[in-house]
Amino acid sequence: MKYKVIVYYDNMPDSEHIFSNKNDAINELHRLSVKYRNSRMYTVELVECGG
């Protein structure tokens, strides 16, 4: 299973980070969420991808 952490700016994809380990993906999700905490234009989400 692969995991993508996607950063959206103004509801458009800005960057993608791909991980094969769920813990690494969650850590990156948390790190980016803290980084963009005060910016309302940015959102971060975790998506599970097949394969």
State where each predicted segment sits:
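A short beta-strand micro-motif
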Residues: 3-10
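A short, exposed loop/beta-hairpin motif centered on an aromatic-Gly-Thr core
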Residues: 11-24, 45
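Short amphipathic alpha-helices within nucleic acid-binding modules
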Residues: 25-29
